[in-house]
Design a protein with these regions (language model features):
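Conserved switch/coupling elements of ABC/ABC-like ATPase nucleotide-binding domains
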Residues: 211-222
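Alpha-helix capping and helix-coil boundary motifs
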Residues: 109, 223-224
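ABC family nucleotide-binding domain
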Residues: 1-203, 208-210
Length: 224
């Protein structure tokens, strides 16, 4: 993943001001900074949820600016996984169907999608909750369902926006363990967080953002 001189303006306001950074396959990078510094805009650019005013965003060798809206949506579903603070699950679908839907939207058959979804729920330790609706799941269980959904299409890049922000301490630690395990088997991670503990536990590199730019970049020593 690469950002090259990315600017994003909303009217007279500059959200990103020449942002440049690069992740290699297998990297685990945390992004931190004060509210309004451009972290969320950065994540939206990488996810293809918003387009830069100028500059280039490249993911998995693809310049996102060269894709039309339909192509961008399909690319995102196939190659980018996303985990959100508040889970973004569909209340009317049980856990298994919430996960399987991610693959069905790329054209995978319902049968194959459900089989893959069940495998992921089993790997994440919640296969016994496959028929449970989100409202009946704990916060930690809901985030595991969200992680399974994000992994359905074997994404080149996994984006996490405050992935433990809505969880209690125990559930948050479990999600951190999960992110570490994923990175250890080669999953590339970009994590936006306000939590220094999450950053030092789950990432090997820290990007500090201020005023829409990379203010500092540093290596992180793993913490327990």
């Amino acid at each position: 993943m690469r950002l090259d001189g990315v600017h994003k303006e909303y009217g007279d306001a500059k959200a990103l001001d020449g942002m440049s950074l690069e992740l290699r396959a297998g990297d685990a990078v945390a992004v931190m900074g004060p509210s309004g510094c451009g972290k969320s805009t950065l994540l939206n650019m990488v996810a293809g949820l918003d387009r830069p005013t100028s500059g280039a965003v490249e993911v998995h060798g693809q310049d996102l600016g060269k894709l039309n809206e339909t192509g961008l949506a399909l690319f995102r579903r196939r190659h980018i996984g996303m985990i959100f603070q508040f889970f973004n699950l569909i209340d009317d679908l049980p856990a298994l169907d919430n996960v399987a839907l991610a693959a069905q939207l790329t054209g995978t058959s319902a049968r194959q999608s459900r089989r893959r979804a069940l495998e992921l729920l089993d790997e994440l330790g919640i296969a016994d909750r496959k028929d449970t609706y989100p409202a009946a799941l704990s916060g930690g269980e809901r985030q595991r369902v969200a992680v399974a959904r994000a992994l359905m299409n074997r994404p080149a890049l996994l984006l996490a926006d405050e992935p433990t922000g809505a969880l209690d301490s125990r559930s948050g630690e479990q999600v951190m363990d999960l992110l570490i395990d994923l990175n250890q088997i080669g999953q590339t991670l970009l994590i936006v967080t306000h939590d220094p503990h999450l950053a030092t536990r789950c990432a090997s590199r820290l990007i500090e953002v201020a005023d829409g730019r990379v203010a500092r970049e540093s290596a992180l020593e793993p913490s327990a």
